[in-house]
Amino acid sequence: MAHETPDTPGETYDFRAIEAEWSEVWEREQPFRTPDASDSRPRKYILDMFPYPSGDLHMGHAEAFALGDAVARYWRQQGFNVLHPIGWDSFGLPAENAAIKRGVDPREWTYANIETQKQSMKRYGLSFDWERELHTSDPEYYRWNQWLFLKMHEKGLAYRKDSWVNWDPVDQTVLANEQVLPDGTSDRSGAVVVKKKLTQWYLRITDYADRLVDDLNQLEGTWPAKVISMQRNWIGRSIGAEVDFVVEGRDEPVTVFTTRPDTLHGATFMVVAPDSDLAAELVEGASDEVRERFRGYLERTQRLNEIERSTTDRPKTGIPLGRTAINPVNGERIPVWAADYLLADYGTGAVMAVPAHDQRDLDFARAFDLPVRVVVDTTQPVTGAIRIIPEDGELPDLEEVLPGRTGVALPGEGRLINSGSLNGLSKQPAIKRVIEQLEAEGRGRAAKNYRLRDWLISRQRFWGTPIPIVYDAEGNEIRVPEDQLPVRLPDTEGLDLAPKGKSPLAAATEWTNVPSPVDGSPATRDPDTMDTFMDSSWYWLRFLSPNDATKAFDPADADRWAPIDQYVGGVEHAILHLLYSRFITKVLFDLGYVTFTEPFSALLNQGMVLSGGSKMSKSKGGVDLGSEMDRHGVDAIRLTMAFAGPPEDDIDWEDVSPSGSAKFLARAWRLTGDITSAPEIEWKTGDEALRRVTHRFLAEAPGMLEAFKFNVVIARTMELVNAIRKTIDQGPGGGDAAVREATEVVAIALSLFAPYTAEDMWRRLGREGSVAFAGWRKAERNLLVQSTVTAVVQVDGKVRDKLEVDAKIGADELEALARETAGVKRSTAGRTIDKVIVRAPKIVSITTTAP
C-alpha cells in the first residue's frame, strides 16, 4: 500500500524521506554505542526481553520495544550512561521443526530470521548498542551455558535421576512442569502431555525455594504485584509438619507432610500416589491379587494427565494395598490406599487423609465406605452431611456419619474435639502442641513443603546446548574439561532430526563416541540438549562482556552495570524465564561471581496488541507491522503504541489511530518551519505565558515518565504544541524566544517516542548533534509559581462571575474589582448588600437582601 502523507497545510512532512536519511546516519555513526568504563556518568542498564527469531517483528514486538526504547532514551536525556543491548534467543523447537519441515539445517532458518528481524529493528529506530549483539545458538555463547552447568554439577546442583516426567507426544521431548499449561497441554505444541519414566537431568532449584520466596519482598513496588503473586503461588511454600507413620511390614516409617497436624486425630486412612516409588514398594509384598489389581490401576493412571487427576468433580478411584499404618497420635490402625488424585511429586507421594475436613478425602471415603471423624468444631451449623461423633470409642457406621451420603467437608478453623488432650484448643495452639509432642517422641517435626519441583533441563532435541557430560563404559558421569568447551553441535548433514522419542544427537555416532577425558578409554556423550530457558536465564550478564573469550562475563562489568535497572517484557514470562533467572543469579552469587541476588531491580510488563478483541495471529489475518509502518510511518506506530493507554493494558489496534498520530507529528514538525529566531536567542526575553506552559511541562514530565505514564506525557506534549501554534499565529509570532524554546522542548520530548521526527526537527532548528543526547532541560522555578489565579465571585451562594487576578492581590482590591463586574451589578441591582466575605485571591462571597 502506498504510504500516506498527512494532508495538512504548509511544508510537506515526508516521513519516508526523514526515515531514510536518519537511518543512514544512525547506521553510520552508531550513536547508541555504550561508552567505555572510563565514563564517569551515573549508569542505567535498560533491557528488553530478547526475541525468539521465528519470523519478522510483529505488533507485539512493536509495543514492547517502543516502550523499552522510550525508557532508555529518557535516561539518556537525564544524563545517564545507558546500556541498552539486544540479542536473540535463537535455540529452540520452532527452528528445529521448521528445519525438519523444509529439510534444511536449523542454523539456516534461524540466522535468516535473525537478519530479517535485525533490519526491522533498525528501521523501527531502536536505540540499541549493536556492538553487543549476541545469539544464544552461537558456540561462543553456549560454551558458557556448558560452563555454568559444569559449575552447578561440581556443587551438586545438577544431577540425573530416573522419574516420571512430562512428555510431549508431538514434539517428542520432555517438558518442565512450568511448560505444561493449566489445561494439561504443552505450551509449544498444544498436545496433551502424558507421563513417561526417563532418566533426566535436573537443577536443584528447590534448594533455593525459601530464598526465591523471601527475596520477592525486595521487589515489592518495582515489580508488578501480579507477577510477584504468581511466583509465590508457583513456588507454593506451605508451613506445617512432617509426620512419621509406621507401616506394617516396612522397616522405615512413611513420612507425610501436612499443613494441618492439628487434625491428626481425624486421619482415618492413608493415600499414596500409584505412580510413586513408595506405592511400588508397598505393593511388592502384597498378594498376587493385589499386585495384579495394582498393575492395572497404575496403567489406567498413566493414561491420565495431571489436570484430569487433580480435578475435583471427577469420581474418585483407588485400590487398597493390603497394608495398614499406625496413626502416631492415637495408635489407630488405618488402611493404606493408592489413589490417582494424589500426584507422585507432591511431598513424599503419600498423605494422611482427614475426610471430615478435606473434600477430596471425603469424596474418596464416601466412594469406598471409609470412616470419617470430625475433629474440629468449625462453629458452622453441622448439616446432615457430617455430625460430630461423641468420644465413646468406636466409630459408628458410615450411614450414621454421613446420612444420605451427601458429604460436605468442614475445612474451616475452630476448637478441637475428638482429639484427646488437644480438645478445646484452637488451630495454632493445637498445631504447636502436636508438633512438640511429635518431636519429643521422634515421630515428626516442623517442616515446609513446596509446590515447586526441581528444574528438568534435558531435552530430546537437536537445536539446543549439548550437555557437557560423557559416560564411561560403566555409565559413570564425567565432566567435559573446561578447556574442551564448547561441546559443539555436529553438522546435520545425513542426520535425521525428526522426533523419535529420543535425542537425534544419539544417531550422530562420530560425535557421540569419544575418548574419555580422564583416561582416553571409549566413552559416550550425553545425547540430550538443555532447556532453552537455560540460555535466557543469564543472557543479560553476557551483554556486559559479549566478546570476552576467557569468561562468561567480567565480574567488574557486573559490578559496574548489574543488576538490570529496568527490564521490559510480557507477563507470560512471569514464572518460567523470570523465576529461572532469579534462581541462576542466586547460584552465581553463591559461587562468588556476582555481588547481588536479584537480576532485575524493576520490571515493566506491557499488555497485548489485539485486533477486534482477539490476539493477533498470521492465520487469522493479524495486522502486519511492516505494512503499518509503510502506511503511517515508523514514528506514528511508535507514538500510537505509547499513547494508547497505560503500558500494562492491552491495545486493540482497531480502537487506536496511527493516522491521528501521523497528523500530530506533521503538525509538530511543521512548527520548525515557522521559527525565525536564532538558536542563541535569550529565552528569558520570550513570551511569559508560553514559557510558563513549557516549564510546567519540563517540571512534571519526568515524574510521569518514570511512572510509565507515557500516554499522559504525550497528551501534555500535544497541549504544548497547541500553545506554540497559538503563540505563532496570534502573536507574538515565530520570532519569539519562547516559541523556539518550547519547540526545542517538544523535539526533546518526542525523541523518546518518535525519534526520526525529533531528529529532523532538531536539525531544522539549527541545533548540532543528536537530539537523543540534548539533555532534559531544567525547569526554571520562578516560572512554576502561578502569577495569576481565577477568583470566583458569588452572590447569595451562586457563582455570578470569575476574575483573572494577580496571585498576590489584597482583599480590598479584590472586593473592589468584584463589585464592578457585570455579573455582580446585575445580581445586586435593586437589592441591599448586607455582607461581603473575601478570601483573597480566590473567593468573594456577597450576601444581599431585598428592600
UniProtKB/Swiss-Prot annotation:
UniProt motif ('KMSKS' region) ranges: 615-619
Residue interval(s) of motif 'HIGH' region: 51-61
Family annotation (HAMAP family): Leu_tRNA_synth_B (MF_00049_B)
Gene: leuS
Record keyword Ligase present: yes
GO CC terms, sorted: cytosol
Binding site for ATP: K618
Compartment list: Cytoplasm
Species whose genome carries this gene: Clavibacter michiganensis subsp. michiganensis (strain NCPPB 382)
Keywords: Aminoacyl-tRNA synthetase, ATP-binding, Cytoplasm, Ligase, Nucleotide-binding, Protein biosynthesis
Enzyme class: ligase
GO terms, biological process: leucyl-tRNA aminoacylation
Family membership: Belongs to the class-I aminoacyl-tRNA synthetase family.
Name of protein: Leucine--tRNA ligase
